[in-house]
């Protein structure tokens, strides 16, 4: 029998091993759909972003008007803009769900894949932050000023780095131009990082809900999981289109409808909702350097999870205490996002400090909880 071309062609062979004949555990659930959904939204962001970049002007006097021009005058410009804006939000929803699944089912034990994933998350956050600055509205300008100014907390060289980032002594034309350039380039870096992420994943094979070695029970990715992924695409695109076409601006900030004005500070400066958990942790420390350390720590602390894992079992499916702690962590994550959007006054300051402490305690107490579960299981 003739060998299919997908198995012999030099390029198609790579795609075949990654998407068609990839051996996959037979019992992976819908929670494993979010990886492919992230690929879908990244592709959509790049396509809509390139179209928007054709009409955007990275000049402080024209950036806000060019966004208005895209929305009003360009054919389907309003659709491209709202798709790009809400696509970023949906990408973060999928990313947090993807990471949550990894934490629940102990996918962090695949150390290389997990650590590359954390790098992808930080790079995605940087890309989204720079994109938020581009409309050059009030929240764009002041968000850029406040967040970049945090770098000045670095001893000795911090202030010089901030001026270097800004391209001057304040956020201005040079800042906008370089942020536009980086925002355009970084998604392609994300594609490369995603390729490395998949490369490491395919070296070890996917994790599964039981946390056991599934080499004896593997099935081809196509057609079993390709159809399953398509169902996930259909469901997520339906929700995405409903929001984009019905409530297109629900995830934006009303303050950003005002052009950037360096002489007028908004009453409450806040980033997009998907950064609010980290912003709340930053604000919970009264010291500037301490806040920056806590912010960076909140993003990189998941990298320690494979070091603190002391359980005999991998997934939390069979660890009831860890399950309770994990879902409390999820609730805490949502609470931190709420606090990040609240004004800096009591009781929000105190609540932010409590929730920030609980966020870090989830990671720090993991080995003790694992050992407690081990003792309880051995007693039985």
Curated annotation (Swiss-Prot):
The keyword Transferase does not apply. A ubiquinone binds at residue 202. Belongs to the cytochrome b family. Pfam families: Cytochrom_B_C, Cytochrome_B. Binds 2 heme b groups non-covalently. Heme b b566 binds at residues 98, 197. It comes from Xenoturbella bocki. The gene is mt:Cyt-b. It is a multi-pass membrane protein. The keyword Cell inner membrane does not apply. Keywords: Electron transport, Heme, Iron, Membrane, Metal-binding, Mitochondrion, Mitochondrion inner membrane, Respiratory chain, Transmembrane, Transmembrane helix, Transport, Ubiquinone. The chain crosses the membrane at residues 34-54, 78-100, 113-133, 179-199, 225-245, 289-309, 324-344, 349-369. Component of the ubiquinol-cytochrome c reductase complex (complex III or cytochrome b-c1 complex) that is part of the mitochondrial respiratory chain. The b-c1 complex mediates electron transfer from ubiquinol to cytochrome c. Contributes to the generation of a proton gradient across the mitochondrial membrane that is then used for ATP synthesis. Its cofactor is heme b. InterPro entries: Cyt_b/b6_C, Cyt_b/b6_C_sf, Cyt_b/b6_N, Cytb/b6-like_sf, Cytochrome_b, Cytochrome_b_C_euk/bac, Cytochrome_b_N_euk/bac, Di-haem_cyt_TM. The lineage of its organism: Eukaryota, Metazoa, Xenacoelomorpha, Xenoturbellida, Xenoturbellidae. Heme b b562 binds at residues 84, 183. This is Cytochrome b. Its main location: mitochondrion. GO terms for biological process: mitochondrial electron transport, ubiquinol to cytochrome c.
């Amino acid at each position: 029998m003739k060998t299919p071309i997908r198995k012999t062609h030099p390029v198609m062979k790579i795609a075949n091993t990654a998407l068609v004949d990839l051996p996959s555990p037979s019992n992976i659930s819908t929670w494993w759909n979010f990886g492919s959904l992230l690929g879908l939204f990244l592709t959509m962001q790049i396509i809509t972003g390139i179209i928007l970049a054709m009409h955007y002007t990275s000049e402080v006097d024209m950036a806000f008007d060019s966004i208005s021009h895209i929305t009003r005058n360009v054919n389907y410009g309003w659709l491209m803009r709202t798709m790009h804006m809400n696509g970023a939000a949906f990408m973060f929803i999928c990313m947090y769900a993807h990471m949550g699944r990894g934490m629940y089912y102990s996918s962090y034990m695949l150390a290389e894949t997990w650590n590359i994933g954390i790098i992808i998350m930080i790079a995605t956050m940087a890309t989204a932050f720079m994109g938020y600055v581009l409309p050059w509205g009030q929240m764009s300008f002041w968000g850029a000023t406040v967040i970049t100014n945090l770098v000045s907390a670095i001893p000795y060289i911090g202030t010089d780095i901030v001026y270097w980032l800004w391209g001057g002594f304040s956020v201005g034309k040079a800042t906008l131009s370089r942020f536009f350039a980086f925002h355009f380039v970084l998604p392609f870096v994300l594609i490369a990082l995603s390729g490395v992420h998949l490369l490491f994943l395919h070296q070890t094979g996917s994790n599964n809900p039981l946390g056991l070695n599934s080499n004896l029970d593997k099935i081809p990715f196509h057609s079993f999981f390709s159809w399953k992924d398509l169902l996930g695409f259909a469901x997520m695109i339906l929700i995405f289109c409903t929001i984009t076409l019905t409530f297109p601006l629900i995830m934006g900030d009303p303050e950003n409808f005002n052009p950037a004005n360096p002489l007028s500070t908004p009453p409450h400066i806040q980033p997009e909702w998907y950064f609010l958990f980290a912003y709340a942790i930053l604000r919970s420390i009264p010291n500037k350097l301490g806040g920056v350390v806590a912010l960076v720590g909140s993003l990189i602390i998941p990298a320690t999870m494979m070091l603190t894992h002391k359980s005999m079992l991998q997934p939390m499916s069979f660890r009831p205490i860890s399950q309770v702690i994990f879902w409390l962590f999820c609730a805490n994550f949502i609470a931190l996002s709420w606090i990040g959007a609240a004004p800096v006054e009591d009781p929000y300051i105190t609540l932010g400090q409590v929730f920030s402490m609980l966020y870090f305690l989830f990671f720090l107490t993991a080995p003790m909880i694992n050992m407690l579960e081990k003792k309880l299981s051995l007693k039985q």
